[in-house]
A protein has these predicted regions:
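Acidic/histidine-rich, metal-coordinating catalytic segments
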Residues: 99-101, 211-229, 252-260
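Short, basic/hydrophobic alpha-helical segments
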Residues: 26, 191-219
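RNase H-like polynucleotidyl transferase catalytic core
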Residues: 60-67, 124-127, 221-224, 238-261, ...
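Mobile genetic element proteins and their domesticated derivatives, centered on retroelements
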Residues: 21-22, 36, 47, 79, ...
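A short, amphipathic alpha-helix used for macromolecular contacts
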Residues: 2-52, 76-93, 277
Length: 354
């Protein structure tokens, strides 16, 4: 007798989990497979199979800035100001330069590696996890575009500069003799140092790299951190005027890192490349971060600007809140098809809010 057709019906019946009981378990008891299985009174293997089938999904919840009513109202107005209501699309954002600071660390406390079967596991040590070597950088980027006058692509990576100082070693050590220049990171950035960085680094870089920089008003968007200067800062405006630049300093809404392309994704891309290096001192760390900044393709930056436009759309639909999922529009697929837009079209749902 041929029983091959009955093969799928053999073995014990599958044990399913009542999915309605999953949501009844408090979230703080659903942090691991072990605790979730214990709360549901099921074996871990049964729960794991449900996760593998997609019946239960894992989720990583990250803290987001708390927003007041005024914060949310400011976010809505800021996002609406980037929409061309007549054409029903977002502005191209070609006249905006985003600036922001970020700490870059020598290494992460926890790193993941893929090892061979017999390979020895790496052993990493540090004197203190709290005081890891780090350097703060200021980055300035804009929307990539084709430079018609130079007939080439302008990547719009204005620059990346470390907040550091060079001191002379006062005494000898096993690493260097007395009198050797030693690079040290600035522990905290003040408004004086921030202003100097804008005047002596950012503005000259804009004048050098930006095509037809004197023919348009360039907005420099910053967040509301305490060391940042006021939009009407006379020293900055005077320095821009001497360079022949028409610069306007603008502030993004408070508690809104998601409205800056650097915080939205570009810093993470730099950091991912930087951690592929293995710096052993501050000079090597600075070089690794600067090399990562230069290696990133301009298309990555352009994609983050398109994501920013979708984030602004979500922000308005959420009435200024930040309880949304970062939308995906298959940018790489659209690019391969030659259909990647310069600006995102306003959805019908968003038009009703304008």
């Amino acid at each position: 007798m041929n029983v091959e057709s009955r093969k799928s019906n053999c073995g014990r019946k599958r044990k399913d989990i009542d999915l309605a009981t999953v949501v009844e378990v408090p979230l703080n008891q659903r942090g691991t497979v072990r605790s979730t299985a214990s709360a549901l009174s099921v074996p871990k293997s049964t729960l794991f199979r449900s996760i593998k089938r997609g019946e239960i999904r894992s989720h990583s919840s990250s803290l987001k800035p708390f927003l007041t009513e005024k914060n949310m109202a400011d976010r809505v107005e800021f996002c609406k100001s980037h929409i061309n209501t007549e054409r029903g699309i977002f502005h191209s954002m070609m006249d905006v330069i985003h600036v922001d600071e970020k700490w870059f660390y020598m290494t992460k406390n926890t790193r993941k590696y893929y090892l061979g079967r017999e390979e020895e596991e790496p052993h990493r040590t540090t004197k203190s996890k709290r005081f890891s070597t780090k350097v703060m950088f200021l980055a300035a980027v804009a929307r990539p575009r084709w430079n018609t006058s130079a007939n080439q692509q302008f990547d719009c990576k204005i620059g990346l500069w470390p907040f550091m100082k060079v001191e002379i070693a006062k005494r000898s050590s096993r690493n260097r003799p007395t009198g050797t220049p030693v690079t040290k990171a600035v522990d905290s950035v003040t408004n004086v140092e921030y202003r100097n960085m804008l005047i002596h680094k950012v503005l000259p870089a804009i004048r050098k790299k930006w095509p037809n920089s004197s023919a348009m008003t360039i907005k420099i968007q910053q967040d509301n951190a305490r060391p940042h200067i006021a939009p009407s800062d006379p020293e900055l405006l005077q320095a821009a005027s001497l360079l022949g630049l028409n610069v306007k300093l603008v502030c993004q809404p408070p508690n809104s890192p998601d409205l800056n392309v650097l915080d939205l994704g570009f810093f993470n891309s730099i950091q991912a490349l930087q951690h592929q290096a293995a710096p052993k001192n501050i000079d090597e760390l600075i070089s690794a971060v600067e090399d990562s900044f230069e290696q990133l393709h301009w298309k990555k930056l352009n994609n983050v600007f398109l994501t920013l436009q979708k984030v602004m759309e979500c922000c308005i639909l959420c009435d200024g809140g930040n309880q949304y999922k970062i939308p995906h529009v298959s940018k790489q697929k659209l690019e391969r098809a030659g259909q990647l837009p310069v600006s995102i079209e306003v959805s019908d749902e968003l038009k009703q809010k304008l």
